[in-house]
């Protein structure tokens, strides 16, 4: 069947990188259709918001870069992960063309590490700290903020502070640590997600829009 339909042979599996994913489409959820249910919101929803935002930036005061990295769930390993030299190589070429040392560029840069955060789920309240959790349709979730809060407020971005889960209850990670190791001020921010890593994840439409709006505000910031 695979050969007849797609031309795939046994040899292709030796070097293929395959993913088995649910076949259903994204859909609206709720009487008010305020939610989106789909496979793979983590982290396509933030990647889309970032790409859509940078494409709308016309004449930024500062150089804008959108880096879409892979393999975050297994520690950002490999040539497409954030641990690879790809980002540093690109930034070195960019800095050399401007006659600026790479380290100086990093010290004066700001990074928005766009990744989803866990939204409070009342069905599994024992693994959340309710007062420190993000809620669906309460805005863009910030895990830590540096100098971006004023930028978001000036752009009328609805945002909320959040943590991934209760202390000692486990949780996920992002690429923020790898950016901070480069001496770049880094903000961990993204869309709150219900049922993260499940075949059917849920996000709020308001959160998606505010994440896009927040990223656009950061790209267009004059500070």
PLM segments and residue spans:
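Acidic, glycine-rich active-site loops and adjacent beta-strand->loop/helix elements
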Residues: 24-26, 68-75, 116-118, 165-169, ...
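A short glycine/serine-rich beta->alpha loop
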Residues: 31-41, 72-77
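His/Asp/Glu-rich mid-to-C-terminal helical/loop segments that flank catalytic regions of hydrolases
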Residues: 54-68, 191-223
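Catalytic-loop motifs flanking and including active-site residues across diverse enzymes
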Residues: 42-49, 185, 207, 211
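Domain-scale recognition of functional cores that engage charged ligands
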Residues: 2, 15, 40-53, 99
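Soluble metallo-hydrolase cores and metallopeptidase-like ectodomains found primarily
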Residues: 1-38, 56
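Active-site-adjacent substrate-binding region
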Residues: 2-7, 11, 119-198
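Acidic/histidine-rich catalytic neighborhood of metal-dependent amide-processing enzymes
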Residues: 48-135, 222-223
């Amino acid at each position: 069947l695979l050969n007849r339909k797609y031309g795939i042979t046994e040899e292709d599996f030796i070097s293929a990188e395959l993913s088995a994913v649910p076949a259903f489409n994204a859909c609206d959820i709720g009487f008010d259709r305020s939610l989106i249910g789909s496979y793979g919101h983590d982290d396509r929803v933030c990647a889309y918001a970032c790409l859509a935002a940078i494409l709308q930036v016309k004449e930024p005061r500062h150089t804008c870069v959108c880096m879409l990295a892979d393999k975050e769930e297994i520690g950002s390993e490999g040539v497409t992960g954030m641990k690879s030299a790809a980002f540093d190589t690109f930034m070195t070429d960019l800095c050399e063309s401007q006659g600026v040392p790479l380290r100086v560029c990093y010290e004066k840069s700001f990074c928005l590490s766009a990744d989803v955060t866990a939204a409070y789920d009342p069905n599994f309240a024992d693994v959340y700290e309710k007062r420190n959790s993000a809620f669906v349709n309460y805005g863009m979730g910030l895990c830590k903020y540096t100098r971006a809060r004023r930028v978001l407020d000036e752009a009328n971005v609805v945002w909320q502070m959040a943590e991934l889960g209760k202390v000692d209850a486990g949780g996920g990670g992002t690429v923020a640590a790898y950016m901070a190791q480069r001496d770049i001020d880094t903000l961990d921010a993204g869309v709150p997600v219900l049922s993260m890593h499940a075949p059917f994840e849920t996000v709020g439409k308001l959160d998606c829009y505010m994440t896009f709006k927040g990223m656009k505000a950061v790209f267009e910031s004059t500070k």
